[in-house]
């Protein structure tokens, strides 16, 4: 999940929906319905490759307030690509600025994001998390 940490910055669901098709030609914005619509304004489906056992792509839950985006992805690579893209096109504030954006559930602690954070850096941090340094499996 990407979440705004105070300040005035908000994610723009319409902007993301407008900018997604050049990257994901089959992108589809679906308005949320029912009780979930109290929190989620819409879902942006970003399909993955259409092949047997292909990654399922990503689904973004765009919070009505613009303060958060839930991310469900088929692979870490797909998630990292989408997270980096969202931060770049949304021009998120720098980590030291009011309204900066945090990536939750990627590392043990919230990760401050910037508009220039590449997907490769997100994947490197994810690999570090899974290394023996973080799991406590240290050779004696």
Regions found by a protein language model. Give the residues of each.
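Short, extreme N-terminal segment that most often corresponds to the first beta-strand
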Residues: 1-31, 137-140
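Compositionally biased, low-complexity repeat tracts
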Residues: 2-3, 37, 53, 95
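N-terminal functional modules and adjacent low-complexity/disordered segments of proteins
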Residues: 4-6, 11-14, 41, 57, ...
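Intrinsically disordered, low-complexity segments enriched in small/polar residues
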Residues: 4-5, 32, 39, 59, ...
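Intrinsically disordered, low-complexity regions enriched in small/polar residues
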Residues: 11-13, 45, 102
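Surface-exposed, low-hydrophobicity interaction/linker segments
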Residues: 18-52
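Charged interaction segments
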Residues: 47-140
């Amino acid at each position: 999940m990407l979440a705004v940490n105070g300040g005035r910055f908000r994610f723009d669901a319409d902007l993301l929906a407008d900018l997604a098709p050049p990257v994901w030609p089959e992108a589809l914005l679906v308005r949320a319905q029912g009780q979930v619509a109290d929190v989620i304004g819409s879902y942006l489906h970003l399909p993955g490759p259409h092949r047997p056992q292909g990654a399922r792509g990503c689904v973004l839950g765009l919070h009505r307030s613009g303060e958060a985006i839930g991310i469900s992805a088929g692979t870490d690579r797909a998630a990292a690509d989408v997270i980096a893209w969202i931060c770049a096109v949304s021009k998120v504030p720098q980590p030291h600025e009011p309204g900066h954006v945090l990536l939750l559930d990627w590392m043990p602690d919230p990760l401050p994001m910037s508009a220039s954070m590449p997907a490769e850096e997100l994947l490197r941090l994810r690999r570090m998390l899974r290394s023996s340094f973080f799991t406590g499996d240290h050779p004696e």
